[in-house]
Structures are given as structure tokens and as C-alpha cells.
A protein has these predicted regions:
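Membrane-interface helix termini and inter-helical loops of multi-pass transporters
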Residues: 29-42
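Transmembrane helix-loop-helix
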Residues: 92-112
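The first (N-terminal) embedded transmembrane alpha-helix
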Residues: 8-30
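Core segments of alpha-helical transmembrane spans in multipass integral membrane proteins
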Residues: 17-21, 46-93
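Non-cytosolic membrane-interface motifs at loop->transmembrane helix junctions
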Residues: 42-45, 76-77, 123-130
């Protein structure tokens, strides 16, 4: 297995940042904000919340796929794989008023899970090279 990030993973990973970047730049560029809100009817906070929720759940599915394909079929990898989904569900249910900062914290919490899957050799060798910058 190579340690070079496959081109499709790199390109699609970077494209996955677009909704985050659009939301970020719309907060510092009034014209972009006006275009998104008026023309496309996009609520920037909703864009961030919905897309971030999707990505955290996607990461759970990714971790589950890595785990189910590994030789190590212990409980810990499966438990770690569902944590992002349980986390996002919990903050949506109980901490709605702090949703955006807690979602941001959820992405930080992915880092130790990524490190675990990489160090345990369940994830591809290039995994952290892709995940940490994203």
C-alpha cells in the first residue's frame, strides 16, 4: 500500500471544503453574502450546520468502513466509528444554542480518531496526510 494520497481522494477532499469556504468568505465579503442570501436563498448559518452535520456523519461511515474491512474486529474501533454521529446527534438535541462552536469542536475531536486508525494500521498509510490538512 502506497503512502501517496490517491489523486481522487485529494481532489474530492479539497472540493469538500467548498461549502466551508463559501460560508467563511460570505462573512467577510458583503457582496458574496448578499448574493447567497438574496439570489440563492441560502442561510449561511444553516449551510454550516447542515453541511457540517453531513460531514461528521460521513466520517462515522468512513470509520465504520475502515473498521469493517480491518483484521482487528475489536469493539473499540467500532465504538470510535460511531462517536461522530452520536456527538452530532447529542448536540443537536441538547445544545442547540451552542451548535456552531460545538460542531467546530466535533471536527477537532476527529483528529484523535484519525490518529488511532492510522497508528493501528487500519487506515491507509496516506490517511493522516489527507485528513490533518482537511
Amino acid at each position: 500500500m502506497t503512502s501517496e494520497i490517491p489523486k481522487p481522494a485529494k481532489i474530492l477532499g479539497l472540493l469538500g471544503l467548498l461549502p466551508f469556504l463559501i460560508a467563511l468568505f460570505s462573512t467577510i465579503n458583503a457582496n458574496l453574502y448578499f448574493l447567497l442570501v438574496s439570489y440563492f436563498k441560502i442561510n449561511i448559518n444553516e449551510l454550516q450546520i447542515i453541511y457540517s452535520t453531513i460531514i461528521l456523519c460521513f466520517m462515522s461511515g468512513t470509520y465504520w468502513g475502515i473498521t469493517s474491512n480491518a483484521k482487528n474486529q475489536d469493539t473499540l474501533p467500532y465504538t470510535l466509528s460511531i462517536l461522530p454521529t452520536l456527538y452530532i446527534l447529542g448536540i443537536h438535541l441538547y445544545f442547540d444554542e451552542y451548535l456552531l462552536p460545538l460542531i467546530g469542536f466535533g471536527f477537532i475531536l476527529l483528529i484523535p480518531i484519525d490518529i488511532y486508525f492510522s497508528k493501528s494500521k487500519m487506515a491507509p498509510k496516506w490517511w493522516l496526510l489527507l485528513r490533518i490538512p482537511l
